[in-house]
Amino acid sequence: MAELLKGAPVARALTEELAARCAALCERGVVPSLAIVRVGEREDDLSYERGALKRCEKVGIEARRVLLPADVSQDELLAAIEDINADSAVHGCLLFRPLPAGLDEGAVAAALDPAKDVDSMTPASLLTTLSGRGEGFAPCTAEAVLALLDHYGVELDGAKVAVVGRSLVIGRPVAAMLTARNATVTTCHTHTRDLAAECRAADVVVAAAGRARTIGPDAVREGQTVIDVGINWDEAAGKLFGDVDFDAAEPIVGALTPVPGGVGAVTTAILAKHVIEAVERAVK
């Protein structure tokens, strides 16, 4: 059976450190604050939101929600972003993505003040992540993947890694970050001819396809480390599933993250870390 790479120990250690840094900022009269912008009521967004609110409370970050209907107009959403930009009491902004059809996500991303972009939404932050240059923050989930691997001592230097998914939110950023750590990375996607073979050849698989159970038993082998980034709500089952078929993979692989309880727990801690760092930069 696979070793379960649980996110709680990683998040707990980060939270303790961040709470001390947050308390020091509060003593200086600065209360770290995060604005969470949610459009609609997707279950995966709601799950992330609940986790983010709990993490902020534990660290001492003031979190405020900006809740907009799924049929919000582009102008209304942009106005909400501009309000956040103009509010000096807000140090970071988290916008749940993807946005509903009809909204221009690129225009919204470009409108956010890069200094408040704690999840690599703006072009400037994304450039930092992909190039390794600049001061922008990496996507929280991508950074959480590396934090988990580091915590459990998974060797990346020279390792073969298959990243399943090429979105700008997770896939491409985490591939770039792994490459910067000297891993040999293969990015897989919908046009990959033999996904299972590419995954089996890897030492580490990062599943970020955004589709439940994309990685089945034919795509894994003994000794592998499998990081499941997926958060997929199954209406019929009434629960969350990852991108990996957990029940099929667990008896085979060497180590595996659960969903929930894996990457997601660390992601909220990284989000809090970015908010604290944004404040520390602002008050230097």
Predicted regions span which residues?
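Positively charged, low-complexity intrinsically disordered leader regions
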Residues: 1-30
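N-terminal glycine-rich anion-binding loops that anchor highly charged ligand groups
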Residues: 24-34, 40-58
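Short beta-strand segments
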Residues: 38, 94-98, 164
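Glycine-rich phosphate/diphosphate-binding loop of Rossmann-like nucleotide-binding domains
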Residues: 39-53, 136-225, 229, 234-250
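Short beta-strand elements in bilobed, periplasmic/extracellular small-molecule ligand-binding domains
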Residues: 56-70, 185-187
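Short, well-structured alpha-helical segments in soluble
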Residues: 76-88
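Anion-binding alpha/beta catalytic cores of soluble intermediary-metabolism enzymes, centered on
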Residues: 92-156, 213
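Rossmann-fold NAD(P)-binding glycine/threonine-rich loop
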Residues: 106-126, 230-283
